[in-house]
């Protein structure tokens, strides 16, 4: 119950609102008989309605907790079924949407006596008076024949309240079942016998209504009652309808907040402005009814790694998923990467899964139905509408794009960029292919980065490649893949992530031991990963033709033999993230030569004097003065292979600290050496003194400031299945006579952005012809520069023509720039090279 004590709440004047929060959440009313009226909310609460609205503080009103009537509360909850048709206009979402024209149906069964459930999660406890089951339009003969009505406070343990048998001849009014005022958070229809339909058996409903006591504190139904924000985002609190019409439709809404230090709310418009991290309640009041909404302002300034898991809802059922999510929370997994729209029973799960995840403080990457309707080809406005559909909802963390795209990867890169540009807190969830199988992998990755990235930090550049083989062997190529992704992340300013093996596929990959699970995480640490992702959570039994036997959660929906190892590894990842979450692995070495990696140099800051297989990483902070750290990984992950490492330190190193147990401990290096005990597959983090830089000296700088730098483009074309001479990275590879970049087919006036890495003074840009595509050379060029990626200054705009040497020189007054943005005049333009010079 809401507190009835009046409190003083901050009330601010009109502020700019975020119109992207207006879409309805799951279960919103559609305006039929039980949703008594639509509420315009912010429009009715205007300053003209009350000249006293701009006061600095206002008192939140108190309202009576007396019951004011009985109304349907199911439509503000979530309906899920043990069997659900999701074709031909049927959906679980229709079971409680207050619209008799949209039906629910179970799938077909071969026997009439098949227990099938349909439940409504009311999201809180109500005193339930009755349940009304309304027949599906045109399918009254498919009304349940024998059934129980049950209640639960947790969705797990059910109590039967009423039963009906031999039900037939149901009219439009349906069947009303007295529930006797039972307290319930869940109401379930358990059907024991179904009617025949074309030789099969199923049941169908038009609506399942739950009539319960309504009070002034739950009569006014909000479009969102749980909102997550960041300090640079906003939302607007709006109301959907009143369950009981106890005030006029024109009644103005007023808004209040419990804690203005966390979130202020405009008294008239309901516009919520974050002010600090934390949780608070905000309220909407219409003169009679007072409804609360939880608001959380998330702290994205913390230094941390993300711990995620790859998730297939199509291998789970509604009655077991809450427990599986509890296991996820307990294991320390904070981000669920959904890849399916429907569960194994046929339910559309987007809204309910997000709700369940939010209750457990887990972020959810949604697989919206639009994903099945060519998301890669969707317009920019349609993609933004998709983000707005879920924006600011509790639990919303990302949008699933695709797993392992092939030649369509550039199309998905465009989608990822649109999502980031609209709201950089939302993660476009996409996983790239591992190395191998096609010759254009470098072009494949670089073009994804070039289209997705820009002046911002990209999150996340992600891929998979597994190493613990079914025959007991180890895939040594994983080190090359990790290093390649690390290098692309550094070049294109991308946080990286990778999938860690936690499954068994017969004949391919083995069940990982605790030490192997930890080593999987330690490898990610060594190579600078920021997103540690477990593959796979639910066991994909029969999925995709691969013979999976288990995942983090076994086929019985209980923790598998690997669960405790995953949990322990996650605890280590969380500790590492507190130190290195905002640092990059700028150099990585091995104690010996392995695939695609260098041997640790003799002049590295520490030199091992023992003889243990190890990985070394030099980290540099992205903040402040760039403090440096060293990570050492025990590469021996066999059971019981804990090792003592001894090291000599570089001459003149004044101090060295070890991160242990959440604190820094000074090591005794007075003798020029020290030792560490590192468990099998585990790692150690060392902190170097402030002001010390132990990176290898950079190569002699070129006069061409663009050489080797990241080139970001508005579009790109390359050949996926064969070696390609077309790629954006060729714009800065120093080769003017071969290869280059080709814009997309419909890209008018395409853009290239060069990141110089730091602010430099420049006065000339050279544009070179793509030697096999001279006719695609742009007819004009506009050049803009920026020091911060926010404020831009145009320094050149003119028609251009390539000279005899195949280049056009664009000169201008000296300007300070980190970013150089070139707009090429024309359609499907091509360039062979770009040079940027100080003189």
Where are these predicted regions, by residue range?
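Low-complexity, Pro/Thr/Ser/Gly/Ala-rich linker/spacer regions in secreted
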Residues: 55-75, 211-223, 228, 294-304, ...
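Ser/Thr-rich, Pro/Gly/Ala-heavy low-complexity intrinsically disordered linkers and tails
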Residues: 12-64, 282
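Aromatic, loop-rich ligand-recognition surfaces of beta-strand-rich domains
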Residues: 99-160, 171-216, 733-794, 804-839
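Extracytoplasmic soluble-region selector
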Residues: 61, 65, 215-301, 699
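Glycan-processing catalytic domains of CAZymes
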Residues: 299-654, 660-691
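C-terminal motif of bacterial Sec signal peptides marking the signal peptidase cleavage site
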Residues: 8-10
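Exposed beta-strand face motif in extracellular beta-rich ectodomains
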Residues: 185-187, 235, 278-282, 684, ...
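Predominantly extracellular/luminal regions of secreted and cell-surface proteins
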Residues: 64-98, 699-733
């Amino acid at each position: 119950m809401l507190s009835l004590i009046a409190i003083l709440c901050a009330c601010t004047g009109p502020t700019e609102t975020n119109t992207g929060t207006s879409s309805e959440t799951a279960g919103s009313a559609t305006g039929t008989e039980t949703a008594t009226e639509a509420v315009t909310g912010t429009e009715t609460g205007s300053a003209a309605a009350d000249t006293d609205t701009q006061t600095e503080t206002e008192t939140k009103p108190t309202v009576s907790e007396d019951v004011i009537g009985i109304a349907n509360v199911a439509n503000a909850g979530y309906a899920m079924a043990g069997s659900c048709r999701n074709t031909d206009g049927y959906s679980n979402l229709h079971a409680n949407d207050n619209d008799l024209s949209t039906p629910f149906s179970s799938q077909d069964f071969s026997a009439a006596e098949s227990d099938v459930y349909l439940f409504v999660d009311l999201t809180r406890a109500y005193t339930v008076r009755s349940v009304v089951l309304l027949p599906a339009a045109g399918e009254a003969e498919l009304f349940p024949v024998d059934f129980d009505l049950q209640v639960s406070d947790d969705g797990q343990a059910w109590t039967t309240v009423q039963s009906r048998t031999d039900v037939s001849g149901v009219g439009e009014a349906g069947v009303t079942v007295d529930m006797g005022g039972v307290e319930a958070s869940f109401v379930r229809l358990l059907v024991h016998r179904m009617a025949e339909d074309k030789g099969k058996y199923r049941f169908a409903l038009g609506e399942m209504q739950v009539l319960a006591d309504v009070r002034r504190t739950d009569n006014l139904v909000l479009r969102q009652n749980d909102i997550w924000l960041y300090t640079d985002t906003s939302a607007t609190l709006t109301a959907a309808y009143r369950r009981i019409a106890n005030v006029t439709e024109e009644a103005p809404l007023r808004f209040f907040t419990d804690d203005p230090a966390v979130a202020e709310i405009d008294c008239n418009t309901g516009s919520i402005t974050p002010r600090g991290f934390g949780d608070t309640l905000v309220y909407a009041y219409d003169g009679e009814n007072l409804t609360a909404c939880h608001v959380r302002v998330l702290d994205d300034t913390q230094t941390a790694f993300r711990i995620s898991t790859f998730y297939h809802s199509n291998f789970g059922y509604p009655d077991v998923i809450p427990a599986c999510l509890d296991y996820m929370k307990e294991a320390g997994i904070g981000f669920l990467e959904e890849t399916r729209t429907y569960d194994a029973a046929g339910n559309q799960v987007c809204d309910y899964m997000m709700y369940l995840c939010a209750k457990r403080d887990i972020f959810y990457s949604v697989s919206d139905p639009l994903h099945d309707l060519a998301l890669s080809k969707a317009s920019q406005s349609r993609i933004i509408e998709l983000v707005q559909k879920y924006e600011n909802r509790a639990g919303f963390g990302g949008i699933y794009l695709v797993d392992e795209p092939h030649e369509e990867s550039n199309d998905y890169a465009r989608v990822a960029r649109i999502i980031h540009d609209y709201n950089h807190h939302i993660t476009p969830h996409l996983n790239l292919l591992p190395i191998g199988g096609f010759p254009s992998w470098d072009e494949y990755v670089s073009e994804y980065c070039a289209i997705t990235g820009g002046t911002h930090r990209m999150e996340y550049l992600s891929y998979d490649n597994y190493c613990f083989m079914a025959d007991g062997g180890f895939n040594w190529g994983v080190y090359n893949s990790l290093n390649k992704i690390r290098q692309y992340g550094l070049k294109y300013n991308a946080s990286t992530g990778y999938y860690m093996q936690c499954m068994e596929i017969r004949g391919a990959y083995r069940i990982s031991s605790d030490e192997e699970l930890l080593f999987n995480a330690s490898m990610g640490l060594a190579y600078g990963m920021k997103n540690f992702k477990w593959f796979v959570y639910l066991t994909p039994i029969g999925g995709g033709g691969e013979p999976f036997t288990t995942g983090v959660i076994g086929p019985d929906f209980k923790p598998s033999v690997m669960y405790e190892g995953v949990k322990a590894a996650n605890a280590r990842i969380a500790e590492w993230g507190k130190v290195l979450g905002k640092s990059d692995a700028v150099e990585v070495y091995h104690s010996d030569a392995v695939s695609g990696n260098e041997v640790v140099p003799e002049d590295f800051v520490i030199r091992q004097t023992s003889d243990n297989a190890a990985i070394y990483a030099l980290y540099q902070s992205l903040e402040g003065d760039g403090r440096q750290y060293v990570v050492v990984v025990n590469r021996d992950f066999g059971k019981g292979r804990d090792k003592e490492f001894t090291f000599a330190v570089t001459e003149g190193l004044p101090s060295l600290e070890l991160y242990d147990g959440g604190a820094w401990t000074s090591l005794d290096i007075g003798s020029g050496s020290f030792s560490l005990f590192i468990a099998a597959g585990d790692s150690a983090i060392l902190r170097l003194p402030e002001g010390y830089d132990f990176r290898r000296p950079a190569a002699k700088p070129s006069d061409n400031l663009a050489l080797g730098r990241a080139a970001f483009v508005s579009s790109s074309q390359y050949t996926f299945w064969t070696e390609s001479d077309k790629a954006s990275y060729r714009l800065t590879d120093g080769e003017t006579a071969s290869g280059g970049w080709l814009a997309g087919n419909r890209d008018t006036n395409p853009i290239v952005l060069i990141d110089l890495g730091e602010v430099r003074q420049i006065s000339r840009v050279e544009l070179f012809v793509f030697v096999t595509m001279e006719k695609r050379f742009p007819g004009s060029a506009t050049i803009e520069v920026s020091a911060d990626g926010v404020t831009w200054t145009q320094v050149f705009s003119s028609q251009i023509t390539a000279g005899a040497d195949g280049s056009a020189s664009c000169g201008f007054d000296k300007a300070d720039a980190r970013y150089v943005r070139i707009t090429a005049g024309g359609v499907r333009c091509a360039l062979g090279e770009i040079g940027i010079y100080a003189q």
